[in-house]
Every structure is written in C-alpha cells, then in structure tokens.
C-alpha cells in the first residue's frame, strides 16, 4: 500500500544502540537475506568511505575524554586524518553501513541517496511534502494528527489518529520506580551502565518529578540526551551486558 514490498525487523540488540552497532545489525540482516544492493539516505553523496575506513583508529583507548562524547572525538579524529566531515546524522549512519559491509567482506553494493527536505533533527514541519520524523513525532505528541496527514502514508495516519501516542512521560513512573528501588549492584549490571552513571541516575530519579527534569539532571557533555534515553530503555527492560552479546539468529518479516 505504501510502495514497500517487505519490512524486516531490526532486533532490539541492534535497534537501541549507538549508530555503529545499529548500522552493523542492519547490514548483517540485509546480507543474510542474500541481497546484492543496500540503499540508504545521506546528507552528502560524495564521501570516500574507503578512505574513512582506512583511517579509523585501531583502538578506542585514546578517546576516553570524560568531558566529551565519544562520537564527536571520533569524528574529529577522522577529519584530521582525511579532511572528510561526517557530523550529520545520516552521513554518520552511512559510514556505519559502509564500515559494517567491509567487515563482512563487502557483499553489498552501496547506494547512498541524497536526503532532501527537512534535516534529521528539524522540529518544524516542512513547507513541502517531506518532513523529518522528529517534527512529525512532535506534532503527534501534541495531538495534531490532521497536520501530519500529508506527510505520512494514509494507513499510518489512520493508526496515529486512533491509537494513543506513547512517549517517555508515560514510561516515567515505571522508570523512576525502577531507578529508586533497584540496588546499585543491580543497576551496575545493566548494559552500558559505565563510569558510575548508575549513582547519578538514581539521584536524578529521586529529585525529579518529570522525565524532562530527569534528563536535565543527568545530562553532561559526555552523556547526551540520546545516550541517556537508550540507557533508560535498558533499565526498563532489565537488559544486561551479557544478554546484548547474544545476536539473534533469525530474520523476522
């Protein structure tokens, strides 16, 4: 109905992850289906992915600067070595796809497609027909279903207009309870719970009345909003580090 022949589920172990793990999970799935081509959006089409791959750091130890997120340090390192900037969301994913494809023997022919219309993080609806997912989600959260109708397939609009839109405000009471009641040792076992961040999360849950306040309390230069929200998903679902090492051996349509 919307021009798509088949949709493949990207499992949780890859979907709720930083961009390099997200993209690697997607590439492995597509390769496992014996596909020959992989098309993806990118802000910049003329990127020498091989040059970036050849110049990435061999070890991550040199990037442990506690006042900055790893991604920005990594991007600056690549720019200093190659003169190529990959600081836009889709370009970052595109590099992840190219790198993951190389690691499994390059079975896929990569086809970057120029992103048009709104940028990934735009929160205002476009005057044209293509808007960012962020802008559409903001409108849905505020109950403006009719406004987004021209930007989404009709089947999607019917779902949005009849089903309740869920966001972090609905999950906050459950998350807050978990963070306050769980022992520190239990929180420490959660995936990506590093550098003692569990103490900061627990204190933030005690002192914050809303999820927005909680995010403001926890955020630092090193811990971005996106990383904190991924960590909250792991806490809600009790996801441990050992569980995330097990890659599902299935393809779900």
Each predicted region: which residue ranges?
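Active-site cores that bind ATP or allylic diphosphates and position pyrophosphate for catalysis
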Residues: 9-253
